[in-house]
Every structure is written in C-alpha cells, then in structure tokens.
Curated annotation (Swiss-Prot):
It holds the Pfam family NUDIX. It is an enzyme of class 3 (hydrolase). It comes from Helicobacter pylori (strain P12). A motif (Nudix box) lies at residues 42-63. Keywords: Hydrolase. This is RNA pyrophosphohydrolase. Residues 5-147 form the Nudix hydrolase domain. Its cofactor is a divalent metal cation. NCBIfam families: PRK00714.1-3, PRK00714.1-5. Belongs to the Nudix hydrolase family. RppH subfamily. SUPFAM superfamilies: Nudix (SSF55811). GO terms for molecular function: mRNA 5'-diphosphatase activity. Accelerates the degradation of transcripts by removing pyrophosphate from the 5'-end of triphosphorylated RNA, leading to a more labile monophosphorylated state that can stimulate subsequent ribonuclease cleavage.
Amino acid sequence: MLHKKYRPNVAAIIMSPNYPNACEVFIAERIDIEGAWQFPQGGIDEGETPLEALYRELLEEIGTNEIEILAQYPRWIAYDFPSNMEHKFYAFDGQKQRYFLVRLKHANNIDLNKHTPEFRAYRFIHLKDLLKKIVPFKRQVYRQVIAYFKREGYL
C-alpha cells in the first residue's frame, strides 16, 4: 500500500477587526496563480510549534502578526495537491494543516510587500461568499473547518 506524504502546515482563518459584530474573513490572491484565493498558510519549520509557525507565517505573508487567537481546529486536516498542479513541494502529495481561527487587531497594518510577496491582493469577504472564491481542491477542507467553528459558536 502506498502511503501519502504530507507537508506539515498551519493555516489562519483571519476575522476582521470588526469581529464578532461582522463575520468577514481575510482571503488573499496568490501572486503566482491569478485568481487563486486562499487563507494565509505555510509550512512548519523543523523544531517549530504550530503556534510559532502561525506567527512567523502571518508576519511573512501579510506583514503583521498582531492577532488574537480565538480557537484552534482540534486535529490535523489534510488535502492532496491536484495531479495536474505544478507545485514547489514535489516531495509531498499534499499538505496536512493545523487551522487557527484568529481576529486581526488592526487591518491597517497589513502589508503584502513587507517580505518576499506571496500574495498580489487581499480582501475581507462575508463568510457566505468564501467558497465561491477558493480554488476547488481546498474547498472541502475549508467547509470542514468552517463547519467546526460554526458548531463551536465562533462563526
């Protein structure tokens, strides 16, 4: 039996500073794939905890890690890379992720160009519009984590 190899990764569902009064989530468009919108995410370095990786990745990708952690998805959740997708992680079949639900403290601190840019644009959108914007191969994972945070009363 062939075992799949997944890259350890963290992902952030970032609520706007207006949370809980407004249920708007941050999404960003990848710089390398036009029209590919997603939550900020990134690999966990060796010796790093998922929480440490979260703070580092947010600083690298959106220029700020001034967040309030609201909750964490209780398990690792994995997705496979599409077979037709050229990706830079050829040693992996996909990614296994730890999801964090966070609230951004100050939206005006977002700077996509603070480090090497990974995103070309960002926006806050209403939760009900989220899945329409996300690439198809990530939708099931997004559905699952959003449903969990809804059941827990966060969304």
